[in-house]
Amino acid sequence: TGKVLSIGFQPRFDVNMQMIKKIVESGELGEVYYIQTGGGRRRGIPGGTFIEQDTAGIGALADIGCYSLDMVLNAIGYPKPLTVSAYKSDFFGKNPEMYPEDSKRFNVDDFAAAFIRLEGGIILDFRISWAMHMDTAGDTLILGKKAGLRIPSTECWNGTVGGPMKIYRDVANEPVCYEVPILPDYSGMGLFDKKIHSF
């Protein structure tokens, strides 16, 4: 058709995010059966056009949640979702004591969670937040039949993992853990530049 499609999630162009996909595709983890992912902020509702359904559509889920979902779904080849059970709330954004200026306009989610069954028998446990009474929604875990991968609590929407990743597996029938160090990026380009060059 002469058309070119580029999936423009900038974190996909980070060397450490790419390592997640390489680990999964290498077979290091074996068949993946469970993923836990998400993220969020203790306080971080952006305001402006982000908090109104007419201009944003949805809140934290679309603003930052899409990056966590893409990080893991891209790594496992985007299997089709079969069923979704989801929940959302707006306890913080609508609270005038916390957000006196914006609470009256706030009509999107500031927290969302979902339990998603994917093709291939994979379970995806997802949660995302703009505001919560917690410092993190937890690390990302990818569990396979041969090994598991822990990705430290990440702000993947900024294009980074939260620290060295760890792989858990058995060696000679003993449980071991080893670290995947943070990789340096020698390209000399930012994520946006890499995205443009890949198009």
Q: Where do the PLM segments sit?
A:
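Active-site-lining helix/loop region of Rossmann-like oxidoreductase modules
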Residues: 78-85, 113-117, 122-128
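Beta-strand scaffold of nucleotide-dependent catalytic cores
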Residues: 32-35, 125-128, 151-153
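Short loop/turn motifs at secondary-structure junctions and domain boundaries
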Residues: 105-108, 132
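C-terminal glycine/acidic-rich active-site capping loop/insertion
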Residues: 88-91, 96-105, 113, 118, ...
